[in-house]
A protein has these predicted regions:
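Short, aliphatic-rich beta-strand segments
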Residues: 24-29
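Short Gly/Ser/Thr- and Asp/Glu-enriched loop/turn motifs at secondary-structure junctions
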Residues: 19-23
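A ubiquitous structural signal for well-ordered alpha-helices
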Residues: 6, 51-52
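Extracellular/lumenal/periplasmic "stalk" regions immediately C-terminal to a signal peptide or transmembrane helix
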Residues: 1-18
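Periplasmic OmpA-like peptidoglycan-binding domain that tethers envelope proteins to the cell wall
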Residues: 33-51, 59, 69-158
Length: 158
């Protein structure tokens, strides 16, 4: 089961899948997952996360990180210290749903908050800020497989 195949029927502007240097990145816009300024996951989000869970549960050797990203607009909501806090809470909310609702093994997941420090666009317009508010699932390559590839490359180079 591939992520593109499973998520293909979702709106392209809300989900983006990229592969760079052997790492798979799945970015999901925050409007699909959360209400503004909130880390409570929406009903629509559970549908998307269920599809992601199906793929990762089919590949038990995959480990992945769930990253929360925000724009740079200061947040003033009770219970949330700042954008970094919000990004961590959003990543953790996604990880908990994957574990509790879809039985993804918690040892395979890392939750990380990135705040507004890794934008995909300048924060100069509301459209660009919306692009920066996202949750990114980073499928991590297994290091032992990575080292095997390096060793093979070294042997081939000799």
């Amino acid at each position: 089961t591939s992520l593109k195949g499973v998520l293909g029927n979702m709106s392209d502007e809300d989900i983006e899948i990229n592969v760079e240097k052997g790492v798979v990145y799945v970015s999901i816009s925050d409007k699909l997952l959360f209400r503004s300024g909130s880390y409570t996951v929406t009903t629509k989000a559970k549908e998307v996360l269920g599809k992601v869970a199906k793929v990762v549960n089919d590949k038990p050797n995959l480990e992945f990180m769930v990253e929360g990203h925000t724009d740079n607009v200061p947040i003033k909501i009770e219970g949330i210290v700042d954008n970094w806090d919000l990004s961590v809470k959003r990543a953790t909310a996604v990880v908990r749903i994957l574990e509790n609702d879809f039985d993804v093994a918690p040892a395979r997941m890392t939750a990380a908050g990135r705040s507004y420090y890794i934008p995909v666009a300048d924060n100069d317009t509301s459209a660009n800020r919306a692009k920066n508010r996202r949750t990114r699932i980073v499928v991590l390559p297994k290091l032992d497989q990575f080292y095997d590839l390096i060793e093979q490359g070294m042997k081939a180079a000799q």
